[in-house]
Amino acid sequence: MLTGINLGSYDDGGADLTDLCRRLLAATADLHGAGEPPCRFRIGSIEPMDVTGEFVSLLAEAEGRICRHLHLPLQSGSSRVLREMARPYDAHEFRQLADFLRASVPSIALTTDIIVGFPGETDEDFEDTCAFVRRVGFSKIHVFPYSKREGTPAAARADQVPPEVKAARAARLRALSDELAAADRASRSGTVELALVETPEVATTESYHEVAAPAGADAGSLVPVHLR
């Protein structure tokens, strides 16, 4: 797993995240035994505005050595709320990125973070978010009810969303996440993916679904699994 705070802002003497990934692919190309799958790695959470065309091209060319899965924190499907959050993109721009990723890497899985109950979030804003995540087709949503952080402008706002409303919205969005995860899993039925064996019982596929680990597979190994 390649992860870090603001991972997409990586810069080492002018070398960016795409350059780093190229170096890692080259450095690990032979780190596998005869008959074993090549070493692969997964990108941690990356901000939408940091996903470049060059990076997407590398992801498409890497043939699964960089997992075809990205976690892109959206936070809200309402452009109005995104402006209130001071996010540097709107819902339309995020959708364009998602469409570009799916066109460039057809089997890609997309997951995200959503904050519900940000100050001033209306029922309409929340419905926009629900509709948006359906359109994008995320395979998993990490749902967080907004909580105050003292000293921030949002914490001082008078239009705080009541706790019971935040809880209801979070529950509904988690149910929607489960529905979308099942739909994504079903769309992959009949395919084979390499899965990382996490424990004797559980493995994680390239598309970030948990599956039963094959009997006798060693923890830390990559094994092909048939998705059903």
Residue ranges and their predicted role:
Residues 18, 22, 95, 127-130, ...:
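Generic alpha-helical structural signal
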Residues 67-69, 105-111, 138, 190-192, ...:
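Active-site lining segments that contact anionic ligands and/or coordinate catalytic metals
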Residues 1-123:
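Conserved SAM/AdoMet-binding glycine-rich loop
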Residues 4-6, 73-78, 145-150, 199, ...:
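Short, small-residue-rich loop/turn micro-motifs
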Residues 145, 156-228:
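Terminal RNA-binding accessory module
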Residues 24, 101, 133, 173-177:
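Hydrophobic alpha-helical packing residues
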Residues 123-124, 128-166:
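C-terminal, non-catalytic macromolecule-binding modules
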Residues 2, 43, 72, 113, ...:
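Conserved, mostly hydrophobic/aromatic
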